[in-house]
Design a protein with these regions (language model features):
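Metal-dependent active-site segment of extracytoplasmic phospho-/sulfohydrolases and closely related
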Residues: 330-372, 508
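Active-site-proximal N-terminal segment of extracellular/periplasmic enzymes that hydrolyze or transfer
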Residues: 64-114
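Active-site neighborhoods of enzymes that stabilize oxyanions during catalysis
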Residues: 191-194, 208-213, 387-514
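Acidic, His- and aromatic-enriched active-site or binding-groove loops in soluble protein domains
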Residues: 140-148, 243-281, 317-332, 373-393
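Active-site His/acidic residue clusters
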Residues: 232-255, 281-330, 337, 367-370
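Catalytic-site neighborhoods of secreted/periplasmic enzymes
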Residues: 173-258, 519
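Bacterial N-terminal signal peptides
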Residues: 46-57
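Short, structured active-site-proximal loop/turn typified by the sulfatase FGly-forming signature C/S-X-P-X-R
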Residues: 94-149, 225-227
């Protein structure tokens, strides 16, 4: 890379945002410097990536597990699995794209893929349980993760002495050392983490919070290399309880990329990391490490375009606005780059590609949109008894309530039913109806006492927010996600039988010739493999000759 190009960006850009957002004379200066160095779009992206990875590489480096060897992968099975989550995308979006754009990357992939048209993500349909479903094979009942932000009756507050038990648990960008910096200011700030009184009042990192192991841990302990890229340093949780599941974890902070265009640049940053990994290097492109056995990333642009005012959908059939369609095209072009790189490296035959989403976004039909009154639920609970609400998460398209006195649950539910229409409440889960879906809140310290599903189209967002869609609830538009599994030996196949994204994890291990029951969640919940996959055919696939 040209040193002058690198120096220009390294000196002037605190975060890698599109230079159009820099104002005044500084913008003119940057434009001049850019002109002088004759930056192309590709050069800008290369410079951004170099700056970012230089910041993130030191805090992402991981030592090899003690005593671990890296044996050559089996030659009688798929050697690599690429897992891609297109956050926000619905199954209807994939179906429409394949029909309307037959030359798109996704349409071409579908010709050699098993497409599950009736796939559902977790409930709640939040990013954390959504991704954990894919990488553990389990529901929130076994992962212990209900939502990105929640409440735990067994933990203590950050910066406390653990004398008081019960605290809100926050695992979003707010636990970064600096959430406006692309590297999170150096990662997670331990002082912002909840504490575990049973373990000497020590901080609970995201990976400590997970109750079951992940595919990354299983594959790494079997001698494979692992890599993942996602939107916050808090995605440390993919490491699993060992804290060491991912060899190469790349988590640039998405908060530092505001607006749709900058979110596309953010996705480009992670795509560049994937291309480096396909080339057999780490995400920075600086070290030869070999192509990962399991690797992947999430895409953000579609979800941002769905949520942003002026974007979203035109009607309930899934017809897209110009900005949402642009985000879809940009993401599809990124997929084409990834597939081209796999082809260039002769890795298509030895790689299984899985495309899905952690969640959808609601509503699709813009006429159903309604912003909830965020004061109604807490005021109603307080009317039963002041201080009864220990924890509350009104986020996206679901509300979760933890009570300080669980014996008053029925009283709170009765009060909520009196405001059901005013508050836009479709369903209240509590008592036996809640226990049909989740662990008993009296025995599991993380399970809410009450879960509220709002009426279709209603979302819980901050006052004054211009968001037009969100996720988290049980609505079809929250949970209906694409699921496409590609291999060049496959023909086109569509399976309409209902499946869950939790079935991805055991299917990945099976495709790699590993035992799915090495996953804790699979053993506990008896998670089945995805139907319709010819694992015998995959294990007979001989990798194409070429550099690995």
């Amino acid at each position: 890379m040209d040193q002058a190009v690198y120096t220009t960006f390294a000196r002037n850009w605190k975060t890698p945002l599109d230079w159009k957002i820099i104002t005044g004379s500084r913008r003119k200066q940057l434009r001049t410097e850019s002109r002088n160095t004759q930056l192309t779009s590709a050069a800008r992206l290369s410079a951004i990536l170099a700056c970012v990875i230089s910041l993130l590489a030191p805090i992402r480096a991981k030592a090899q597990l003690p005593g671990q060897n890296r044996p050559a992968p089996r030659r009688d099975s798929v050697q690599h699995v690429l897992l891609l989550s297109i956050d926000g995308m619905h199954s209807i979006d994939l179906a429409n794209l394949v029909k309307d754009r037959p030359d798109s990357a996704l349409a071409k992939l579908s010709r050699h893929a098993v497409t599950y048209s009736n796939a559902s993500t977790s409930f709640p349909s939040n990013s954390w349980p959504g991704l954990l479903s894919m990488v553990t094979g389990g529901s929130p009942n076994v992962t212990g993760v209900i939502f990105e932000n929640s409440f735990d009756r067994s933990l203590s507050a950050p910066a406390s002495d653990c004398s008081k038990i019960g605290t809100t648990v926050i695992f979003d960008s707010s636990i970064d050392k600096n959430r406006d910096a692309v590297d999170g200011g150096g990662g997670i700030d331990p002082d912002k983490l909840p504490k575990d009184p049973k373990k000497g009042c020590t901080p609970v990192f995201p990976h400590n919070f997970i109750r079951v192991n992940t595919i990354f841990e299983v594959i790494r302990r079997s001698g494979g290399r692992t890599a993942w890229s996602d939107k916050h340093p808090a995605y440390d949780f993919v490491n699993g309880p060992s804290g060491t599941g991912v060899d190469d974890l790349f988590t640039p902070e998405v908060r530092s990329f505001r607006g749709l265009k900058n979110t596309e640049w953010y996705d480009d940053l992670k795509v560049a990391a994937i291309l480096n990994e396909i080339n057999g290097r780490d995400h920075t492109g600086t070290r030869e490490v070999g192509v990962p056995t399991i690797f992947g990333m999430n895409f953000q642009a579609i979800s941002v375009a769905q949520k942003t005012a002026g974007g979203g959908y035109v009607d309930g059939s899934g017809r897209m606005s110009a900005s949402l369609e642009g985000a879809l095209v940009h993401t599809d072009e990124s997929l084409e780059k990834i597939m081209s790189k796999l082809r260039e490296r002769n890795l298509l035959d030895s790689t299984l590609v899985i495309i899905t989403a952690k969640h959808g976004d609601s509503p699709i039909d813009p006429t159903k949109l309604k912003h909830a009154n965020l004061e109604l639920i807490p005021k109603t609970v307080a009317s039963v008894h002041e201080g009864l609400l220990a924890g509350l998460e009104q986020d996206g398209s679901v509300a979760l309530l933890w009570l300080s006195d669980q014996d008053r649950t029925a009283d709170v539910v009765n009060a909520l039913r009196k405001i059901q229409e005013e508050a836009g409440i479709q369903e209240i889960y509590s008592g036996e109806s809640l226990k049909l879906l989740f662990n008993d809140p009296k025995s599991d310290p993380r399970v809410p006492d009450i879960i509220i599903q709002p009426t279709p189209g209603q979302i819980y967002v901050d006052i004054g927010s211009t968001f037009i869609a969100e996720h988290g609830g049980s609505a079809n538009t929250d949970r209906s996600v694409p699921l496409l599994i590609y291999h060049p030996r496959f023909g086109r196949q569509e399976i309409k039988f209902p499946v869950q994204t939790s079935q991805i994890a055991p299917s990945i291990l099976k495709a790699l010739g590993l035992n799915p029951f090495t996953l804790d969640a699979v053993r506990i919940e008896n998670t089945p493999l995805l139907p319709g996959l010819d694992f015998g055919q995959l294990q007979r696939s001989v990798p194409s000759p070429g550099r690995k």
